[in-house]
């Protein structure tokens, strides 16, 4: 939870987190990550759409943590019955993974703050506090350490789309 995220961010930011980079197939990493989704998600339809044989360079433990975090957020902040789609593609010379949901989305005024460490915003789902900060700050730091980007865009017609990139493997 929160303590693990905070410890990970601290280790990441001061260079104590050791990375073990290996070449991994996107579809396998996505499938394995879904086995770690903690909450019961029978009420949610989780769909994967992944290009075959996309090999990316990553620390697989950390990238799985990013994926689990993004999918958990999508489950937590969308009503039961929502569809969550995880896509893996090769785009512009990079591996790209996106987690899309068709929930209420994130209000415009919150978007510029969601990667801040302790930011919490209000959402419409039972008007609960959306404590995005720590998890998303950690995800952002992990992806940056992989020389990638993590961005939030709106998912048409409503919902969120978190997309991150990773370097492709340099396999001949």
What residue spans do the PLM features occupy?
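Acidic ATP/Mg2+-coordinating residue in the GHKL
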Residues: 101
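Short conserved segment of the HATPase_c
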Residues: 106-118
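Short alpha-helical Gxxx[C/S/T] motif in the catalytic ATP-binding
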Residues: 135, 139
């Amino acid at each position: 939870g929160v303590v693990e995220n905070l410890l990970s961010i601290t280790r990441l930011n001061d260079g104590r987190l050791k990375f073990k980079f290996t070449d991994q197939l996107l579809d396998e990493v996505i499938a394995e990550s879904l086995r770690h989704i903690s909450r019961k998600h029978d009420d949610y339809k989780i769909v994967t759409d992944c290009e075959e044989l996309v090999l990316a360079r990553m620390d697989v433990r950390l990238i799985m943590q990013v994926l689990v975090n993004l999918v958990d957020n999508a489950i937590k902040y969308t009503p039961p019955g929502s569809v969550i789609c995880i896509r893996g593609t090769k785009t512009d010379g990079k591996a790209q993974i996106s987690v899309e949901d068709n929930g209420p989305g994130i209000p415009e005024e919150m978007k510029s703050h969601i990667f801040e460490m302790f930011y919490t915003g209000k959402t419409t789902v039972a008007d609960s506090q959306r404590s995005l900060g720590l998890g998303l700050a950690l995800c952002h730091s992990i992806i940056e350490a992989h020389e990638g980007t993590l961005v939030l865009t709106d998912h048409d017609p409503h919902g969120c789309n978190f997309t991150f990139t990773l370097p492709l493997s340099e396999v001949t």
